[in-house]
Amino acid sequence: MSGNEAIAAAARDAGFTLGIGYPGTPSTEILEHYAACGGRAAWAPNEKVALEVGLGVAFAAARALVTMKHVGLNVAADVLFTAAYTGVSGALVIVSADDPGMHSSQNEQDNRRYAVAAGVPMFEPAD
């Protein structure tokens, strides 16, 4: 099982209401697998909209999974910081798929800094 498949299965098993994101390698597979294993998934027109929709789901006391590649979090940063200070009634999990070594992206950035700056919990997968 790949990391993307594990994220999708965990969201499904945890009873997430919606998985939403903007397609971009290396994060695209997460929502594809989430939909394939029975989760309700949708693509948004951009990363900001994806996070806004996910935030709305979490405001309604439901669980939302939001996926995007690392540069997409730049687009969604306003919403991320707003969510950090408003809080949510449900659950909001944001998966930012970084691309060390720029295998499929135009830049390399470390999005763990966003979590630190926003003061939100962060999980970092490891072997």
Can you annotate each of these PLM segments?
Residues 1-122, 126:
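Thiamine diphosphate
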